[in-house]
Amino acid sequence: MATLKEVQLKIGSVKKTRQITSAMKMVATSRLRGSQEKMDRFKPYASKFSEVLGSIAGKAGEEASPLLVPREEPKKVNVILCTSDRGLCGGFNVNLIDKADKFIKSKLQDKEVTFTCFGKKGRDWAKKMSMTIDDQYLGVVGGKFDFSVASTSGQKLINRFLEADVDEVYLVYSEFKNLARQEPVVKQLLPIPSLEAMEKPDEAGAKEETAYLAEHICEPSSDALLGEMLPKNIFIQIYDALLQTSTSENAQRMKAMENATKACKDMIDELQTIFNKTRQAGITADLMDIVGGAEALN
């Protein structure tokens, strides 16, 4: 059985750990609030842009942009993998990496796969698997970033697609549903899916708005306008994915630190019980010695 001093030291150590996890939970909560507000502010713009794009797509032809044209035999694929730079966020990074790994093995087995990595965890995994990393952006997910990160990385991939250096581009990120639910998803960025998909509004209210927009005349033409808007749409999707992944990371880190803090409390309660039992056993043994000595004197 451990001595009283040993148990006291363990209790002190766990209390210090609880202070750290509690502080980390508070930081994660603050960051979650900030990233969620940023995501919510961006959502109306992205939604309206999608509505306008959908209305123009209904008038444009399939040859309006080379970004719409799929390759006959795609061989070169780039996967944008969004992960965090740090751990201590539950299964957040593991789930994203597992999603990317399963997607590659099931859909891209016979293709030349390269990576654009947002975050150290994804980059380290790609290196460990001897994958080719074309580009990497660290300190983005979970940190401070703006739209320029998405436009810079997106423009590089668009240029490579137009130069036939890459045939397809996929985006792996964490979709933020709510505080209790975040799901890793895979989305195709290039070539851009069919125009018919753009015409379908996501919400019932957007249908009337799209019909209203369809009455407008596009100058110089729908094809020309669509050609200008499609690259911007790529940037918006990347930026939205980064916002959702950052929010998901902070939500999972907050939950992980909350669970760790609760685990510390439970451990302290257990150690305190052990401490009390050990002290009680020591007192009982001392009393037995005193009683035994008194009887011996009598």
From Swiss-Prot:
Swiss-Prot/TrEMBL keywords: ATP synthesis, Cell inner membrane, Cell membrane, CF(1), Hydrogen ion transport, Ion transport, Membrane, Transport
InterPro entries noted in UniProt: ATP_synth_F1_ATPase_gsu (IPR035968), ATP_synth_F1_gsu (IPR000131)
Domain of life of the source: Bacteria
Residues annotated as signal peptide: none
Main location: membrane
Subcellular locations according to the entry: Cell inner membrane
Keyword Magnesium: no
CDD domains: F1-ATPase_gamma
GO biological process: proton motive force-driven plasma membrane ATP synthesis
One cellular component term from this protein's GO annotations in UniProt: proton-transporting ATP synthase complex
Membrane topology: Peripheral membrane protein
GO molecular function: ATP binding; proton-transporting ATP synthase activity, rotational mechanism
One Pfam family named in its UniProt record: ATP-synt
UniProt keyword Oxidoreductase, yes or no: no
Cited function: Produces ATP from ADP in the presence of a proton gradient across the membrane. The gamma chain is believed to be important in regulating ATPase activity and the flow of protons through the CF(0) complex.
Similarity remark: Belongs to the ATPase gamma chain family.
Subunit-structure text: F-type ATPases have 2 components, CF(1) - the catalytic core - and CF(0) - the membrane proton channel. CF(1) has five subunits: alpha(3), beta(3), gamma(1), delta(1), epsilon(1). CF(0) has three main subunits: a, b and c.
NCBIfam families linked to this entry: ATPsyn_F1gamma
Protein name: ATP synthase gamma chain
Species of provenance: Desulforapulum autotrophicum (strain ATCC 43914 / DSM 3382 / VKM B-1955 / HRM2)
Recorded name of the encoding gene: atpG
